[in-house]
A protein has these predicted regions:
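Short, hydrophobic beta-strand segments that form beta-sheet elements in well-ordered domains
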Residues: 15-28, 52, 125-127
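Adenosine-cofactor binding site in Rossmann-like domains, unifying the SAM/SAH pocket
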Residues: 19-44, 57-64
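Rossmann-fold scaffold of SDR-type NAD(P)-dependent oxidoreductases
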Residues: 49-58, 65, 80-83
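Short-chain dehydrogenase/reductase
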Residues: 66-70, 109-110, 148
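C-terminal helical subdomain
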Residues: 136-193
Length: 193
């Protein structure tokens, strides 16, 4: 996706401690198929990773990937998992019921692992608001990429379990405008048909 490419480009082009950050972009299926045997979890493999950005939403796969990464890295304090979730994970604010449930599942597991397990790795869940919208106040890809860079590089001894990030605009106003735009879009397309 455009956001994934932007994150990769930002991390690889912004020096950190005199070096660049190498980014690997595995497919969801590679991790799900290989479980804890995925090459990125194998520290003996030259292509292993130190940070897993649990990014791609596909049903409940992000929750499954978090559980696999937890088992792989449970005892490794040098590893870091960053989940991409959504403001929609919060109770009763999203009209996308299944999407909200999938993101809520990810947040629930993340909180359980943070507060009820003996994990050693760092874990952050980013709840993103509206992203890269042409007509409404929204986060840009660069906003999110900068946040990822900051999380990875700025706080080596601090764990930030959860952060909600959104454009500086009144939530109810944005949602109302979003509903209006969706209705206009719907009527334009149904009138054409």
């Amino acid at each position: 996706s455009g956001l994934a490419k932007n994150i990769k480009d930002t991390l690889e082009s912004t020096p950190y401690k005199g070096d660049t950050i190498n980014v690997s972009t595995p497919r969801i299926s590679d991790i799900l198929m290989n479980d804890v045997r995925w090459y990125g979890f194998d520290t003996e493999n030259p292509n292993h990773v130190d940070v897993l950005i649990n990014f791609a939403h596909n049903d409940f796969d992000q929750t499954k990937i978090l559980e696999i990464a937890h088992r792989a890295w449970k005892n490794d304090s040098t590893k870091y998992i960053i989940n991409f979730s959504s403001r929609a994970s919060q109770p009763n604010i999203s009209k996308g019921h299944l999407y909200a449930s999938q993101k809520s599942s990810l947040n629930h597991l993340s909180n359980n692992l943070t507060y009820n397990s003996d994990k050693s790795y760092k874990l952050t869940t980013l709840n993103l608001g509206l992203l890269n919208h042409d007509d409404l106040p929204s986060l840009t890809w660069q906003d999110v990429s900068g946040m990822i860079y900051m999380l990875i590089t700025s706080y080596p001894s601090i764990e930030i379990p959860e952060v909600t990030v959104q454009a500086h605009a009144n939530y109810q106003d944005v949602q109302s405008d979003k509903t209006t735009l969706n209705e206009v879009y719907y009527h334009l397309h149904t009138d054409i048909l």
